Amino acid sequence: MSELNVITKERTAVINPIVTCQPLGAMYAVSGIERGMPLVHGSQGCSTFVRYGFARHFREPADIAVTSLHEDAAVFGGRKNLISGLGNLAARFKPDVMGVVTTCSSEIIGDDVAGFIKTAKVEIAKKMGEEAANKIKIVQINTPSFVEHQFKGYDNAIKAIVDTLAEPKDEENGKLIIIPGIVNPGDIREIKHMLSLMGVEGILLTDTSDPFDSPLRPSKADKNPYYQKGGTPLADLQDCANSLGTISLANYANSAPASLEKKYNMPSKVSEAPIGIQNTDSFIRTVKKFTGNDVTDEILDERGIVIDAMADVASRYLFGRKVAIYGDPSITVGMARFVAELGMIPKVVCTGVKNEYFVNDLKKVAKESDEDIDALFGQDLRALDVYLKENPVDLMIGSSDGRLMAKDLGIPLYRVGYPVYDRVGYQRRPIIGYNGALNLVDGITNTILDKYYETQDWKLQQ
């Protein structure tokens, strides 16, 4: 009988980690707000590291401010830095939303961030006037870097945004809230595409599609200050409390749906990322349940195209091939189910996160695929390297961080997730939805053919 075999970590040291710290997830979330600006309350490196990572992956600049704490802040605190930082941002950039993202240093110091924000609001009102100051919303996001990971930081940020900005009204707005998780601009656009085909108006918490894949064209908006096009408008964030329901497409982003449900009696569904046929079917059914809108022929046609593509290649090139998957826990579970749908064997799944959601989800995949799956939960790429040397596979699926391991082991690597920095265009190419599944079918098959398609067989295929 198929089962999930969880392999426990045998060392305390982390070698080549798969996850990073909480603030990255919070900065990503705030960057998806129209005229939104993250302000990192920490040292310069806390923002520089993330900006560098975003620039490598998205090939776009990221506007992230920092209070630039130094050694003296460890003794005297960062009050002056945060208050002046908020004031400077408000005066120079005039953002709609400023997200104050805490870090290791500010959390360990014990800075009264909430108190500093109140003082900063008073100072901003003195300089800019009450009316202008009231238009700028400040969201406090606690993300201590010494615990958890970027996915927890993202979850904390989305909850803080909702709790701070949502304003209940007497009537529903007829909109559906979607929390996409940490995904690429191409995935966000695919989510909006599916909602559009069903005639559903959605509120993305948050929409990073244009901010991280912005068109290079003259802006019609005020050029001083200049903001990237797109993002979730402040009005939509305030209107969240009046929506039909909330669907989170990442199991780690469950705090905001729970908060909205508790405060406003709003139905919610926390699920896996809609990767592959089964997961996308589930997403479409949930949207239909929440809105009452029918599934259109256009969506059924897109689904049919993927099924046809799978039938073309699965039995011929993919069936029975063993796969190692690593990275974002929500994406890895979705990818494990999808490769099983292709007739492949998800031999091992490795992620830097461990919680009951992912364990239970992967158990379901093992049962559905009738295959034993080895799971490296809460581990790193070193653990995966050791495993693969003893248990070889035919394909690796994950981020660019595993490229050297794949090269050393002679295993082809199909790149998904974050970060991908040694190839271009992956941030624009969806893996979510039926169109994303089609990209995966083609990409996985071509990666297999590049490695295992023998030259002596070429004439037979002509």
Curated annotation (Swiss-Prot):
[8Fe-7S] cluster binds at C21, C46, C104, S145. InterPro entries: ChlB/BchB/BchZ, Nase/OxRdtase_comp1, Nase_comp1_CS. GO terms for biological process: nitrogen fixation. Its EC number is 1.18.6.1. GO terms for molecular function: ATP binding; iron-sulfur cluster binding; metal ion binding; nitrogenase activity. It catalyses: N2 + 8 reduced [2Fe-2S]-[ferredoxin] + 16 ATP + 16 H2O = H2 + 8 oxidized [2Fe-2S]-[ferredoxin] + 2 NH4(+) + 16 ADP + 16 phosphate + 6 H(+). Its cofactor is [8Fe-7S] cluster. Binds 1 [8Fe-7S] cluster per heterodimer. The keyword Oxidoreductase applies. It is an enzyme of class 1 (oxidoreductase). Keywords: ATP-binding, Iron, Iron-sulfur, Metal-binding, Nitrogen fixation, Nucleotide-binding, Oxidoreductase. The keyword Iron-sulfur applies. Belongs to the NifD/NifK/NifE/NifN family. Tetramer of two alpha and two beta chains. Forms complex with the iron protein (nitrogenase component 2). This molybdenum-iron protein is part of the nitrogenase complex that catalyzes the key enzymatic reactions in nitrogen fixation. This is Nitrogenase molybdenum-iron protein beta chain. It comes from Methanococcus maripaludis. The lineage of its organism: Archaea, Methanobacteriati, Methanobacteriota, Methanomada group, Methanococci.
